[in-house]
Amino acid sequence: MNRNLFDFKPSEWLPVKDKAVLEHCRNIKREEMETTNENGYSIRVVPHPSSAVACELFDWIYRSDVEDKKTVIVFPNSWKNIYTSVANMCNVFNVSARNIHAFCMDEYADEDGNVAPISWNRSLGGHFMTEFYMQFREDLRPPLRQMHYYTNENINCYSEMIEEEGDGGADLIVSATGWVGHTAFIDPLTKAFKADNLEDFLKIKAGFVDNHRLTIQQNSGGVSPLWHTPRYSVTIGPYDVIHAREHLERHDLQNVGGYASWERMISRLQLYGPVCMEVPASIYQLTKGTIYVSEDMARPIEPLDLIAL
C-alpha cells in the first residue's frame, strides 16, 4: 500500500497496530503459503477446506471405532454442513462414534454470567447436538453422557473436565479463526484474557468473557441487529489449546463472495505473524496440527485505488 500519499494510525481498539507486521503479512504470496514449522504445524491450501476438514474428522471417528480407542475432541459451533456430512458418512459406512467424547468449544452467556441453555434457539451447544449428535443413526451415536456442553454448573471446571477426560488434554481441537483473530471466544483486549506475558496467557483456562466488538459483529452475521447478539460468552482458554495433542483448522471466506479482505488479513496474521496475545489464534503455531486454507483466502490482498474521473 502506498502510504507516501496518505498515512494514518490504525484504530486503538484493533488488536494489531504494528504497520511492519501488517505489511509483511499482507504481502505473503500464494506460493509462500504452504509451510510446516518445527512443531509440526502444517498449512495447506486447498479448493474446499470444509470438505478437507470433514474427511479428516471422519477419519478420526473411523480410527476411534476400528481401534476401539477413546477419543476426546473439542468441537466448534456451528458447522452444520461439516457435521451433517461426517455423520452421514458414518451412517453410510456403519462407522460407530461410540468412543467419541465431545466438548463444545464455547457458548453464549448473559451479563450476569448465566450460560445460554441448549434449549435456546441460538445456543451453540444446542446447534452442535442437533447438527452432529442427532444426525448419527441411533445405534452409531456416542452415549449421551459423552457429549459435554457448557452449563452454569460446569463453567468453572470445564478445562479440568477436558483434562480429566483426555488424560491431560483433548486428543483433537477443531477450530477456525474469527475476525478479531480469536479461536473459540478467546478474544484479545479483554479482561478475561489479559496477561503480563505470553507464558502467563497460555495458562488461562476456560471462563467467562466480555467479547470484543468485532466478535459481536461477526456473531451477528454482519447483518443482524447488534443488540440482538449476546455480548458475553463462555469459552475454552489458551491452556486447553496448548494441551491438546492435535489441532485441525479451516480458513475459508464467509462474506460477499470472497471479497472480504479483512478475513484474508486476519488469516495471514495468525499463520505468518508473530505468536502473540493480540492474535490469540497465533498460538496454534506452537502446536502440532493441520490448517486448510481456501484458494480464495490465499488470493493477494490488493486495496482498491480511488480513481479521479
Question: What are these language model-derived features?
Answer:
Residues 2-20, 32-33, 37-53, 236-309:
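ATP/nucleoside-binding phosphotransfer catalytic cores, i.e., glycine-rich phosphate-binding loops
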Residues 19-41, 50-54, 95-174, 227-228, ...:
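Ligand-binding beta-strand-loop-alpha-helix segment within the catalytic cores
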Residues 56-69, 241-242:
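Glycine-rich phosphate/diphosphate-binding loops that line cofactor/substrate pockets in enzymes
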Residues 63-94:
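Glycine-rich N-terminal segment of FAD-binding domains in flavoprotein oxidoreductases
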Residues 73-83, 154, 177-182, 255-256:
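Gly/Ser/Thr-rich loops at beta-strand to alpha-helix junctions
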Residues 86-97, 119, 188-197:
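A glycine- and small-aliphatic-rich helix-loop capping segment at beta-alpha/alpha-beta transitions
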Residues 159-160, 183-190, 194-197, 259-263, ...:
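A short secondary-structure junction signal
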Residues 175, 182-234:
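Class I SAM-dependent methyltransferase SAM-binding "motif I" and its flanking Rossmann-like core
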